[in-house]
Amino acid sequence: MSDINATRLPIWGIGCNPCVGDDVTSVLTRGEALC
């Protein structure tokens, strides 16, 4: 899942939750507001 992390995380903030992998998709939907 490295590709997802390298492609998604930097978009909304890699410093927010670098441990997020499979949940990155869900986090982007709801976590976007949290960050």
UniProtKB/Swiss-Prot annotation:
Residues 1-10, 19-35 form a propeptide. The modification 4-hydroxyproline is found at P18. The modification (3R,4S)-4-hydroxyisoleucine is found at I11. Keywords: Hydroxylation, Thioether bond, Toxin. Processed by the macrocyclase-peptidase enzyme POPB to yield a toxic cyclic octapeptide. POPB first removes 10 residues from the N-terminus. Conformational trapping of the remaining peptide forces the enzyme to release this intermediate rather than proceed to macrocyclization. The enzyme rebinds the remaining peptide in a different conformation and catalyzes macrocyclization of the N-terminal 8 residues. Expressed in basidiocarps. There is a cross-link at I11-P18 (Cyclopeptide (Ile-Pro)). GO terms for molecular function: toxin activity. There is a cross-link at W12-C16 (2'-cysteinyl-6'-hydroxytryptophan sulfoxide (Trp-Cys)). The modification (3R,4R)-4,5-dihydroxyisoleucine is found at I11. Belongs to the MSDIN fungal toxin family. Major toxin belonging to the bicyclic octapeptides amatoxins that acts by binding non-competitively to RNA polymerase II and greatly slowing the elongation of transcripts from target promoters. The typical symptoms of amatoxin poisoning are gastro-intestinal distress beginning 6-12 hours after ingestion, a remission phase lasting 12-24 hours, and progressive loss of liver function culminating in death within 3-5 days. One of the few effective treatments is liver transplantation. NCBIfam families: amanitin (TIGR04309). This is Alpha-amanitin proprotein 1. It comes from Amanita exitialis. The lineage of its organism: Eukaryota, Fungi, Dikarya, Basidiomycota, Agaricomycotina. The gene is AMA.
